[in-house]
Amino acid sequence: MYREYKPNILLAPYIETYWATDESLSGRQTLRILPDGDINVLFNLAENEVDIIKPFIPYIIGTKTTFSNVVHERADRMIGVRFRPCAISAYTKVPVYEFNNCRVDTSLFLSLFADFNSERLAEKEDEIERLNYIEEYLLGKLNCLNNIDKQFIYVAEYIRMTNGMVPVNKLLDKVCLSQRQFERQF
């Protein structure tokens, strides 16, 4: 079953939602994941070392540009943090496009979860305790965020609000940029 939880109001400019799933499967299933423009940080809560995503280690799941089929052969238990468009840039200096169509172990580079204590997450008894632990960690990082150009965030949100169906000239008028300025930044 899939559930969503709202973030703390201080994290709301960066995090769209937390989500959790615990699927009980009665055999092999293939799920089609459609591109949604989001970047997620994913925690696998199933303690199975065979999994591609190691248990309790945070992974960045980059923006998908095409659908992907994910094969599940047993029960899945995961927690995710879905970031708002461009907001993960506040937590890492790696350009967002570097994560496109990728699954990256956050311990491999300097990022928001570089010093995250996965063992403490594993010790938590239930989903709510784990979500609270992740949120407390993210709240603790608020004082060391990278600056993000507010105009950049507004452009990304506006494109998302219009489902990408906005002519470039209208977008430029809306965000008060010339085409040349827009091309330099985007």
PLM ranges: what are they?
Residues 1-163, 167-169, 174-179:
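Alpha-helical bundle regulatory/interaction domains
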Residues 186:
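DNA major-groove recognition helix of helix-turn-helix
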